[in-house]
């Protein structure tokens, strides 16, 4: 049952990786791991980057849009080449490094994933997509408290960044066994994205388990 939980995918969670080019900010019960696998499956959709300079050269925008289109189509080999060329010519856009991190994570290349995320966060320490991807990397490598810190920073700088709330729910329930915190962040995710039937089931499950724990604690007192 636990293995089943680690493989189910939430389409709404995966869909939160928005392809906005330069503008804006930028996988026992139900499986919470699906958001953590977004970069390996449905996932791979490119993220947007925050502007590092006020003017976007037209040629840079064209290159970025072409790279994100190739990545969204699932051709990670071509997308990686395009983003590598992009960051050589235009090294000041953190979103491009985040997309490289997603590609490297898809290829299970953790060192390159970390290098790309470090580059993105050096440009913008508060970049929510970079922080979220860093949390995923840290979680995969068993660094749960560091992952928590990365996710929490993402939702602090961008409270409406639903995917980081989702990943906090995953982390708190499956790895840190903090059910009330997991419930809080799944509810925040659901409030932001709307009708996700799978997450609705998870919330019901967690609500029941939290209530049972509270009853047990009351009896013990």
Stretches with model-predicted labels:
Residues 60, 94-95, 128-129, 162-163, ...:
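Helix-start (N-cap) detector for alpha-helical repeat units in TPR-like alpha-solenoids
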């Amino acid at each position: 049952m636990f293995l089943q939980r680690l493989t189910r995918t939430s389409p709404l969670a995966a869909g939160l990786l928005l392809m906005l080019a330069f503008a804006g900010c930028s996988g026992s019960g139900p499986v919470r791991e699906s958001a953590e696998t977004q970069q390996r499956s449905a996932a791979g959709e490119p993220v947007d980057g925050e502007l590092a300079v006020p003017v976007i050269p037209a040629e840079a925008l064209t290159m970025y849009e072409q790279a994100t289109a190739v990545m969204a189509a699932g051709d990670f080999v071509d997308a990686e080449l395009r983003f590598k060329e992009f960051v050589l010519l235009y090294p000041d856009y953190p979103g491009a490094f985040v997309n490289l991190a997603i590609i490297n994570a898809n290829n299970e290349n953790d060192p390159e994933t970390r290098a790309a995320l470090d580059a993105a966060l050096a440009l913008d320490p508060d970049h929510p997509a970079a922080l979220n991807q860093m949390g995923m990397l840290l979680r995969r490598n068993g660094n749960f408290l560091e992952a928590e810190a990365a996710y929490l920073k993402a939702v602090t700088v961008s409270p409406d960044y639903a995917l980081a709330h989702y990943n906090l729910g995953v982390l708190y329930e499956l790895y840190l066994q903090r059910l009330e915190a997991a419930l809080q962040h799944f509810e925040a995710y659901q409030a932001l994205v709307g009708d996700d039937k799978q997450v609705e089931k998870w919330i019901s499950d967690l609500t029941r388990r939290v209530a049972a724990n509270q009853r047990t604690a009351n009896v013990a007192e």
